Amino acid sequence: MTTDTPPPKPGLTYAEAGVDIDAGNTLVDRIKPAAKATSRPGVMSGLGGFGALFDLRAAGYADPVLVAATDGVGTKLRIAIDTGHVDTIGIDLVAMCVNDLVCQGAEPLLFLDYFATGKLDVAEAATIVEGIARGCATSGCALIGGETAEMPGMYAKGDFDLAGFAVGAMERGGALPANVAAGDMILGLASDGVHSNGYSLVRRIVERSGLGWGDPAPFEGRTLGAALLTPTRLYVQPALAAIRAGGVHGLAHVTGGGLTENLPRVLPEGLGIEINLGAWELPPVFRWLAAEGGLDEAELLKTFNAGIGMALIVAPDRAEALADLLAGAGERVAVIGHVTEGAGAVHYRGTLL
C-alpha cells in the first residue's frame, strides 16, 4: 500500500504577510524633497542611512549642552483619521516636541519621526510627513530621519500612530528656568485653539452634542472637524528671539494639565503664581466645550490651554520690551499674572466663563 506524499506548500513572501518593502521605498523617495527642504547648518547626511549625522560646531556651538524631547499627538489622531484630513497633524507632532525644547532654553536642531500603521498608504503617509517637514522648517530644525513601520495585525484598517523625537542645544550656562523670582511678570502667548491635549474629553463632548465632524462648528465658520484639527502653534522662533533679547527667566508650554499643572513646573521652591483670568478673552472653542460638556472653570483650566499656549516668566523691567518684541513677531501677547511668594501653586483671580 502506497501513501501519497502531499504536494509541497507554496513559499511565502513578506508582501503576502502584509509588509510591502517596495511601498516603503517609494515613500522614502517621495518625502526626500520635503526633508531636504528642512536642511540647516550642521546636517551632515540625508535620509536612507543607518543613522543621521549632525555637526554641532557647524551649527555654531562652542560648548553645547544637548536637550531632547519626545511626544505624540494623542487622540487628536482619531479626528484626523476619521475625517481623512491628515495634512496638518504632522505640524502638531513637531510642535509638541520643539515647543517643549525651547522651554529649556534650547534651539531645536533636528527631528525624527515614527509612523506606524497596519497597511501603508504611501500617499497618506507622504502627506503626513510633508506636514512634519513644514513644522520643522518653521521651527528651524532639520527632519533628519525617521521610521515607517508597517505592522499587519497591529492596527485596525486605516489607523496609524505617530511619535516624534527632537534634539536641541544651548551653550553651557544657558539652561532655563533660571533666576525666577517673586515679582516676575508672566506673558501669555495666545493659542490657535485646542492644540494637541484634552482630545479624549473633546471627543466625548462632541459625541454628547450629537454633531458629526462634517457639521458646521457651533463656534466658527468651518466644519467641526476642520476647526478641531487646527494645528498646534509653533512658538520656537519668537520664544528664541525673546530669550536672546534677555530677561526671560522661564517658559511653560501649556499642554496636558493646562495652566494649573504646567506653570508650577518652572518655579523654584517657595514661589507661587497668581493669574488674572480677566487678562485675556476665552476663545469660542473653549466656551463651547465648557458649555456643551458642563465643565467648570477648574476642569477647563486643568485640561485645556484655555487660550494661552505658551507662558514666559520675565523680569519686571523687561516685560514691556519683551511683549513688544513678541507682538512684532506675530504673537498675541497678554500680561496674565506674576510670580508670588508662596508654595508652588497657581492661584486664579477673576473668571474666564
Curated annotation (Swiss-Prot):
Pfam family, one: AIRS
Compartment(s) of residence: Cytoplasm
UniProt keyword annotations, A-Z: ATP-binding, Cytoplasm, Ligase, Nucleotide-binding, Purine biosynthesis
InterPro entries reported for this sequence: PurM-like_C_dom, PurM-like_C_sf, PurM-like_N, PurM-like_N_sf, PurM_cligase
Coiled coil (UniProt feature): none
Family: Belongs to the AIR synthase family.
Name of this protein: Phosphoribosylformylglycinamidine cyclo-ligase
